[in-house]
Amino acid sequence: MTAAFDGPPLLVANAPDAPDWRPDLRTIPDVRPGLGSLGGIYTAVVEAPAPVVCVAWDMPFVPEPLLRRLGAGLREHDAFLPQSGGRRGVEPLCAAYGPACRDAIAQSLEEGDLRAIAFHARIGVGILPLSEVGRFGDPELLFFNVNTADDLEHTDEMWRRLESSPSSGGRTPERPR
């Protein structure tokens, strides 16, 4: 993400040892703990000095050019999300959020609606169509979440395939440390 935005990312994490994960990053806990993913998005919007592009920690295959494209979408929208084949149809944990999202998210949190897309009706949301997302890679791979030991093992296999694939053209995302 540093390469995508000319500055270090902000790590929003609640684990007591989170600052040890990446000591080179500013790490902050949720400003309103216990509110799930929406609470994390809210924290990023509140704490960052500018609009933010959020990427879930467990999405290792999101490439820099996609992050840049999402950030560019904020020129015309309050939030900009990639379309996906997931259950929501969009990926709110790999998306760009502008300052207008702050109050809209706060209202959803106050109402107890913790869905990551709960505040979308209150702001101008843009969607990066799946056809354009596909230009950055296979959406299923791009938005793959690592939630279990099996997922982690599968991730290692996918990294090896990506790194050895001639079709990647050297465009594989930076491999996590």
Tell where the protein language model's regions lie, with residue ranges:
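Conserved anion/nucleotide-ligand pocket segment
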Residues: 144-146
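SAM-dependent methyltransferases
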Residues: 149-177
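Nucleotide and nucleotide-moiety/phosphate-recognizing core
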Residues: 1-113, 117, 121-142, 153, ...
